[in-house]
């Protein structure tokens, strides 16, 4: 809404996409090819296949230097979860065993397979992270 109000013509409205789908809308590969993808609070409230699809498609769609930005809570290796995130993770897994906080190392490994470099991690309020992956030049 703010982008439309401010006349930011280079920001499209949010798209409803099945992240796990084999194919994404053809328009994303043509007139609406993204320079960045911003995904907020999705990969922990979806099956792992959704994270895999998001990273795979982002790797195909984004140009070198393009950004994939993920926002939300993550597990961080062997670090214990904060009590609030531990309770949230348990609640998610109780509602659906395919849901839950994802390990950042596993997400980064998927990103590397899709052609992204090491993530830049920004600590955010409420034990969330902004994780920025940049697409690397083709090898």
Question: Where in the sequence are the language-model features?
Answer:
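Conserved Class I S-adenosyl-L-methionine
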Residues: 81-105
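Core SAM-dependent methyltransferase catalytic element
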Residues: 114-139
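A short, conserved alpha-helix within the catalytic core of class I
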Residues: 45-61
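Class I SAM-dependent methyltransferase SAM/SAH-binding core
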Residues: 1-26
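A conserved beta-strand element that flanks and buttresses the S-adenosyl-L-methionine
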Residues: 38
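Glycine-rich phosphate-binding loop signature in dinucleotide/nucleotide-binding domains
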Residues: 28-33
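Short alpha-helix
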Residues: 3, 97-115
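Conserved beta-strand signature within the Rossmann-like core of class I S-adenosyl-L-methionine
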Residues: 62-77
